[in-house]
Amino acid sequence: MLYSASIQSSEARHVDPSFAVWISAINLTGFRNYDQLSLHFDGQPVVLVGANGAGKTNLMEAVSLLAPGRGLRRANTAQLQRRSPVSATAAGWSISARIETPEGPFQAGTGMRAEDISEKPRRQIRIDGVDQPQMALAER
């Protein structure tokens, strides 16, 4: 379980918005140990705290998959699918995030449909709802 926390400091620290790139919302569906997860952020630093197996690294892996490459664990894309204790069949997985940039916000997403997991294990990338090559993530 992930909890939200706030740390008070006597010294206010602000990020210059002309350089800031940050995730304001992230949604995971069928990804690793998450059936559904929706988190919203305000641009402040985030600390993930929880017991072993709570999903901290899985959340970081989800963020890393919104950049070009194979993610921080370099896992096979078919392994990213959440397997339910009730059913071992794949149902697809997705990660989407609203990313704030100096040029304005955009929506980025990646995932696999269930039929793609068994046929051709390649994840799809979408930016603002349009299919894109993986390198398009680096251009934003």
In which residue ranges do the predicted regions lie?
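Pre-Walker A-like glycine/lysine-rich segment at the N-terminus of P-loop NTPase domains
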Residues: 2-7, 14-64
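Nucleotide-state sensing region of NTPase/ATPase domains
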Residues: 67-140
